UniProtKB/Swiss-Prot annotation:
<comment type="function">
    <text>Involved in phosphonate degradation.</text>
</comment>
<dbReference type="GO" id="GO:0019700">
    <property type="term" value="P:organic phosphonate catabolic process"/>
</dbReference>
<keyword id="KW-0670">Pyruvate</keyword>
<dbReference type="InterPro" id="IPR015421">
    <property type="entry name" value="PyrdxlP-dep_Trfase_major"/>
</dbReference>
<keyword id="KW-0032">Aminotransferase</keyword>
<protein>
    <recommendedName>
        <fullName>2-aminoethylphosphonate--pyruvate transaminase</fullName>
        <ecNumber>2.6.1.37</ecNumber>
    </recommendedName>
</protein>
<keyword id="KW-0808">Transferase</keyword>
<dbReference type="GO" id="GO:0047304">
    <property type="term" value="F:2-aminoethylphosphonate-pyruvate transaminase activity"/>
</dbReference>
<comment type="similarity">
    <text>Belongs to the class-V pyridoxal-phosphate-dependent aminotransferase family. PhnW subfamily.</text>
</comment>
<dbReference type="InterPro" id="IPR000192">
    <property type="entry name" value="Aminotrans_V_dom"/>
</dbReference>
<dbReference type="InterPro" id="IPR015422">
    <property type="entry name" value="PyrdxlP-dep_Trfase_small"/>
</dbReference>
<dbReference type="InterPro" id="IPR012703">
    <property type="entry name" value="NH2EtPonate_pyrv_transaminase"/>
</dbReference>
<dbReference type="Pfam" id="PF00266">
    <property type="entry name" value="Aminotran_5"/>
</dbReference>
<dbReference type="InterPro" id="IPR024169">
    <property type="entry name" value="SP_NH2Trfase/AEP_transaminase"/>
</dbReference>
<dbReference type="InterPro" id="IPR015424">
    <property type="entry name" value="PyrdxlP-dep_Trfase"/>
</dbReference>
<feature type="modified residue" description="N6-(pyridoxal phosphate)lysine">
    <location>
        <position position="194"/>
    </location>
</feature>
<comment type="subunit">
    <text>Homodimer.</text>
</comment>
Length: 365
């Protein structure tokens, strides 16, 4: 049990360690040499987490939520005559579509039900039929439900048809092993407050250098200009163009050190996976069924179907909060669900305590 007023069983923001919180008790200057050196170390560590072919990739940090970084990529990477195929089966894929439409980018959608993974056959059919598509985007872990999408197959198809690949790995990077060079991912986006277990305040983009260089002058926004942000960090030793979240960066650096101490991404994945499997098994015992088929389920967050018509999520939420737990409501339209996250500083004992608390307040059957 961590020293928190609530245990956040959510997909980020999430429960952080005491040591991550403690580094935010101090103040730093954005122009300080030591701080900028830390920014450079963070950038390098992220690339090393993403691939062994580190010389081919670089990292750009971007102020704001993860969505800001996604929009920075969409608005900077796709040229005026570009066209994007978006694979969507949840709120975050739909958000990418909305961004493209707001930025007047031509977009095609491959949509599946929220509990079904991206349909590779349909994706290939679209790529065969529409030769104008230049980019393809997919969400790795769609936290709307907790489903994992087949990014290996999507990126393989993307490269087979000569497309630039964009992967929203917001809720998976750092918790699921990904080699972006091996998967031929051109741009991967994630956030400080997800599986690396930092706090909210910035997102990051791990980009193939060759593709990033093509983005100069293409941005549709000043503050979300991915190329300019990178060029400043690259040429001015870690400096951000605009005020950076200094406390958040220090917390993230500490979180990276703690990820290494835990044993890296593989070890963290194992903990998350054990949490998720234990959660599902215990929840089944008291009558709750997961929405997503086991073979498509991520270790990040799990959606559970309301057991009966009389089930009152708000009542359960309030009872759990009194017991020191915070969970998530559902986010899909066709099935009543609620969600429980498995990531953050959460361990087996926490899962047992949570389900015991749920069982105390809910009688099914």
């Amino acid at each position: 049990m961590t020293e928190n007023h609530y245990l956040l069983l959510t997909p980020g923001p999430l429960t952080t360690t005491k040591t991550v919180k403690e580094v935010m008790l101090y103040d730093w200057c954005t122009w300080d040499v030591e701080y900028n050196m830390m920014v450079q170390q963070v950038r390098a560590k992220l690339v090393s987490l993403a691939t062994k072919e580190e010389e081919r990739y670089t990292t750009v940090l971007m102020q704001g939520s993860g969505t800001f970084s996604v929009e920075a990529v969409i608005g900077s990477v796709i040229p005026k005559n570009g066209k994007m195929l978006v694979c969507t089966n949840g709120a975050y894929g739909k958000r990418i579509v909305q961004m493209a439409e707001m930025l007047h980018i031509d977009v095609v959608v491959s949509q599946t039900e929220e509990w079904e993974p991206t349909n590779i056959v349909e994706v290939e059919k679209i790529l065969q039929q529409d030769k104008e598509i230049t980019h393809i985007a997919v969400v790795h872990c769609e936290t709307t439900t907790g489903i994992i999408n087949p990014i290996v197959d999507v990126c393989k198809l993307g490269k087979q048809y000569g497309k630039v690949t964009l992967v929203d790995a917001m809720s998976s990077f750092g918790g699921i092993e990904i080699d972006i060079a091996e998967l031929q991912i051109d741009f991967l986006i994630s956030s400080a407050n997800k599986c690396i277990q930092g706090v909210p305040g910035f997102g990051f983009v791990i980009a193939k250098r060759d593709e990033l260089l093509k983005c100069k002058g293409q941005a549709r926004s000043l503050s979300l200009d991915l190329y300019d942000q990178w060029e400043t960090m690259e040429n001015q030793n870690g400096k951000w163009r605009f005020t950076s979240p200094t406390h958040v960066v220090h917390a993230f650096y500490q979180a990276l050190l703690e990820l290494e101490k835990e044993g890296g991404v593989k070890a963290r994945y194992n903990r998350y996976d054990n949490n998720q499997k234990l959660l599902v098994n215990r929840m089944r015992e008291i009558g709750f069924k997961p929405l997503v088929d086991e073979k498509y389920q991520s270790p990040i967050i799990t959606s559970f179907i309301y057991p009966e018509e009389w089930f009152d999520f708000e009542q359960l939420y309030n009872e759990l909060k009194r017991d020191g737990f915070v969970i998530y409501p559902g986010k899909i339209s066709k099935v009543d669900t609620f969600r429980i996250g498995n990531i953050g500083d959460v361990h087996e004992a926490d899962i047992h305590r949570l389900v015991d608390s749920i069982a105390k307040g809910v009688v099914i059957g």
